[in-house]
Structures are given as structure tokens and as C-alpha cells.
Regions:
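Short, amphipathic alpha-helical interface elements at domain boundaries
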Residues: 2-125
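Leucine-rich, amphipathic alpha-helical/linker segments
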Residues: 32-75, 156-211, 279-281
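Intrinsically disordered or highly flexible coil/loop and linker segments, enriched in small
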Residues: 77-78, 136, 207, 248
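Active-site-adjacent structural elements in folded domains
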Residues: 113, 181, 226
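Short amphipathic alpha-helical interaction segments
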Residues: 117-133, 139, 226-246
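Accessory beta->alpha helical hairpin/"wing" motif in late/C-terminal subdomains of nucleic-acid enzymes
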Residues: 124-126, 133, 137-176, 249-281
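Elongated scaffolding segments in large macromolecular assemblies
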Residues: 184-281
Length: 281
């Protein structure tokens, strides 16, 4: 059992409320393996980089990243504001092109007199991911496609797009933005452990609170909060980023709050967990 002494802490026991986390089934060595960056040699988490054109098209985040790239190429750059966001005119055009599951633009914009890039969250996230992946860059007041971004449009390179975006989303980007700063970046530092735990315990419906306790490793800072916000942090930073993956689909549906939109929607075959090097008690 992993971290037996840690689990005896009265605060941890009170938070768990009788739930035994899935990750306690792992040996310490296996737990460490899941905390490795996926590109590491013999990583326990394998990210598929040879998806078909159809599979890529089935992923909203990949599909809309390609739309952003094509627009940047066709328009010879997308105008930016002084703050670095896409111009309102560009955002208005992108609103017509970008579609997202369970995302109602009319509802999302009902209180906005004008629509800026951060107001249209699917576009904002796709732009941030594309820029982090160096598919686009800022040049002379415009967002332009890089040589890498142009090359990813080819059928030969497109199959690796989702692997790049998935890796960046969980292991490079700061997802605390989606949790409105609550609990910092937790539980993103243990993304691999959380994904493995979801894959083994999310076969049946679970409430958000229980699934959070099954899949995450608590931290001391959590217990200083007046209210328990761990389920919200888990939903905002992990489950909504996974919605649409084959082995995580149940977990994502269980955790998603009514009316919320999944921002990272991955193809069904984009990520898998290789359990062969993992051992459990």
C-alpha cells in the first residue's frame, strides 16, 4: 500500500470519509511511474501519435485548432489587440466557424455587450494550446502560423496533432485558470495518477465528490479551506479536459456539472494507459 502513514492523518481520513483511493492499489514504484512525463522512455502512459484523419476530425479541440491554423494562413495572420488577444472582428468570425459540444454561445454570451477572445472560451483555449505547441506565434501585431503549424495540416503530420495538444494540456499548461484559482494547480501535478485511477474505477456512475476521493491524492492546503472545493477543482482541471476519451468517458460524464462545457475534447484512441509495467497489491 502506498503512503500508509499519510493515509492515517485524521484530516485525510475525514476527507476520504471511508473511501479507499484507487491509487492505494499501486506499489510505490508504480505510483512513481505514473508521475513521469508521458514522453519519457517506457512511460506508463502512452499517447497515440498516429490517429487517422477521421479520428482527428472527431476531436473538437483538434478540429478547431486546424480551423484556427487555416484562418491564420488564409488571412496572412489574425489581428491582435494591444493586450495580445484576437481582435473582436476576428472573434466574431471565429464564432461562426467553431462548434463545441454542449457549448451554447447564446447562453455563454448573454451578459456580454461585446465578445472578446477570453469570453469565447473554446477559441481562447485552442489559441493558447496552439501557441504553446508553437503552431502559431505573434508577429507584428498578428497571430501567424509557424512552419510547424503549416506542416501539421498535411495528412502525414496531422495524426500527431492530438498527442501534442493532450500532452501540453495536462503536463505543460497551467490548468488552475479553469478552477478559478481554487486549490492552485491541484490535482494537475498528479495527472497521470488521476487518469489511471479514473480508468480503473469509473466504470459505474459515481458522484463527483466520491470520484474525486477515489482518484486524487489530497494535499495539506486542501484542509485549510472553509468549504470543500476539491470536486470542483477535479472537474475543472481534469475531467472536463478529458471528456470524449474512450476510457474516461464515464468519469467525465459523472463529473460534469449541468450546463458546463468541456474545453478539451479528445479522440477516443488518443491516450491509453499501459498497465503492464504497473504492479498493485
Amino acid at each position: 500500500m502506498v503512503a500508509a502513514d499519510f493515509l492515517q492523518d485524521p484530516r485525510v481520513q475525514g476527507w476520504l470519509d471511508g473511501v479507499e483511493p484507487a491509487w492505494t492499489l499501486l506499489t510505490f514504484e508504480s505510483l512513481l511511474a505514473l508521475r513521469h512525463d508521458p514522453p519519457a522512455v517506457q512511460s506508463a502512459i502512452q499517447i497515440t501519435n498516429d490517429l487517422s484523419v477521421g479520428e482527428i476530425a472527431g476531436s473538437p479541440v483538434a478540429r478547431n485548432t486546424l480551423i484556427l491554423l487555416r484562418q491564420a494562413i488564409e488571412r496572412v495572420g489574425l489581428p491582435l489587440t494591444a493586450t495580445g488577444n484576437l481582435s473582436r472582428a476576428t472573434v466574431a468570425e471565429m464564432c461562426k466557424l467553431i462548434e463545441w459540444p454542449d457549448y451554447d454561445q447564446a447562453d455563454a454570451f448573454r451578459l456580454n455587450k461585446v465578445i472578446n477572445e477570453p469570453d469565447f472560451l473554446p477559441l481562447h483555449v485552442v489559441r493558447q494550446l496552439a501557441q504553446a505547441a508553437t503552431l502559431v506565434r505573434v508577429q507584428r501585431g498578428k497571430l501567424v502560423a509557424t512552419p510547424l503549424g503549416k506542416s501539421i495540416l498535411s495528412d502525414a503530420k496531422r495524426g500527431s496533432l492530438l498527442a501534442v495538444l493532450f500532452h501540453l494540456a495536462f503536463w505543460r499548461m497551467d490548468l488552475s485558470y479553469f478552477g478559478r484559482g481554487l486549490l492552485g494547480s491541484w490535482p494537475q501535478a498528479d495527472a497521470g495518477v488521476v487518469l489511471w485511477s479514473l480508468s480503473v474505477c469509473a466504470n459505474d456512475w459515481q458522484c463527483a465528490e466520491k470520484l474525486t476521493r477515489l482518484c486524487t491524492i489530497p494535499e495539506p492546503a486542501m484542509f485549510s479551506e472553509t468549504w470543500d472545493r476539491t470536486a470542483y477543482a477535479m472537474e475543472a482541471k481534469i475531467s472536463d479536459r478529458c471528456s470524449g476519451s474512450d476510457y474516461l468517458s464515464t468519469a467525465a460524464k459523472n463529473l460534469r456539472a449541468a450546463g458546463s462545457a468541456s474545453i478539451i475534447f479528445i479522440a477516443r484512441r488518443s491516450c491509453s494507459i499501459d498497465c503492464s509495467p504497473l504492479t498493485s497489491r
